[in-house]
A protein has these predicted regions:
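N-terminal helix-turn-helix DNA-binding core of bacterial DNA-binding proteins
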Residues: 14-55, 60, 66-68, 175-184, ...
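Conserved GNAT acetyl-CoA-binding A-motif
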Residues: 43-44, 213, 235, 241-255
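C-terminal "cap" of GNAT-fold acetyltransferases
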Residues: 139-143, 248-268, 274-319
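Acetyl-CoA-dependent GNAT
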Residues: 132, 139-213, 217, 222, ...
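Conserved N-terminal entry element of GNAT/NAT acetyltransferase domains
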Residues: 84-87, 121-145, 149, 292-298, ...
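Basic, amphipathic "hinge/linker" alpha-helix immediately C-terminal to the N-terminal HTH DNA-binding motif
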Residues: 39, 75-99
Length: 319
């Protein structure tokens, strides 16, 4: 991996003091590009690039001194600072795009047609896997904006895919208190500070402080990151949380149109059982027995290979 990093940084010119011969290092050029034609608020920019506040402030100050960027309070919220490109900044961004395209062409030009196809395909795989490694899973209060955004997108996709649409009020809606400890929890997946998926756990039949079984709910992945294994990662994380709480079994339900989810569940060891609830949108009910502590690391690796071959992405998993 370190050798790969060295080759890429050298070939891309990332170590040059004047990236693409424009008189500024790669860090400044990247920030200029990320601000984009529409501008961006500083917090979003910092989260997107994973930059330290002090470093980003210095980069923006350097770009502003060159007349490329203007930093000012937002017109809609004076507490929020935004960065926008000046006319010179827009021209510089366009020139960086042109020169980046030229570098890409210079990389591909010496290669044969088959080699080019292999390189582009390999780049896509590396990008997808590196993106997957950057996604973070964290418990989230159902009232948090990230939670509301994820669940809202989840419900909207169900409404678009289900025959006859989807009405949350008919689907055994959860009270927010059902998805926070000790009753349950909600996990939200974030990439560069933005929500890209979620999954919930609700404990049932609690005996002596531990649930006899837990229900997995609201499992969803944003379409732009499907195929990166996030659906299975959320599923395993929820199984582990259920086992840690003392549950012996996890159950879930799903709709017949969500074939991707059904394939994943079966690949991950879920077996179909009779209905355990009266959800009007469910056609299949599944159950899985848990080992104490949840899936072991070796088991997770084997299952990961199996599920990657079985399903390319994870749509909304259940109603």
């Amino acid at each position: 991996m370190r050798r790969f990093n060295r080759v890429v940084t050298q070939r891309a010119g990332a170590l040059d003091d004047a990236f693409l011969a424009r008189g500024r290092p790669l860090g400044q050029a990247r920030v200029l590009w990320e601000i984009g034609p529409e501008g961006v608020d500083i917090r979003t920019l910092r989260n997107r690039l994973g930059l330290d506040s002090g470093y980003l402030s210095r980069v923006l100050a350097a770009l502003a001194a060159d007349g490329l960027v203007v930093v000012r309070p937002s017109e809609t919220d004076r507490r929020v600072r935004t960065a926008r490109l000046t006319r010179a900044g827009l021209a510089e961004r366009a020139e960086l795009d042109r020169r980046n395209d030229a570098v890409a062409s210079s990389i591909l030009e010496p290669l044969g047609e088959a080699q080019r196809a292999r390189l582009v395909e390999a780049m896509a795989v590396v990008e997808r896997l590196l993106t997957a490694s950057m996604i973070r899973l964290q418990p989230c209060d159902p009232r948090h904006p990230h939670a509301r955004s994820s669940l809202g997108s989840y419900f909207a996709e169900l409404a678009a895919r289900f025959d006859g649409g989807f009405d949350i009020d008919r689907a055994n809606p959860d009270d927010p208190s059902d998805l926070v400890p000790p009753a349950g929890l909600l996990l939200v997946a974030t990439l560069n500070g933005e929500p890209v998926g979620c999954g919930a756990l609700r404990h049932h039949d609690v005996r002596r402080g531990a649930p006899h079984w837990s229900e997995i709910k609201r499992l969803w992945v944003v379409p732009t990151v499907r195929g990166a294994g996030l659906g299975r990662r959320l599923l395993v994380a929820l199984e582990q949380r259920a086992a840690a709480a003392g549950a012996r079994t996890v159950r879930l339900d799903t709709n017949r149109v969500l074939t991707e989810a059904i394939t994943m569940y079966r690949a991950e060891g879920y077996r179909e059982i009779p209905a355990f609830n009266d959800n009007p949108y469910a056609h299949h009910w599944f159950e899985k027995r848990l080992a104490p502590g949840g899936p072991r690391r070796g088991q997770a690796r084997v299952a990961s290979t199996r599920s990657t071959n079985a399903v390319s992405g994870t749509a909304p998993a259940q109603a």
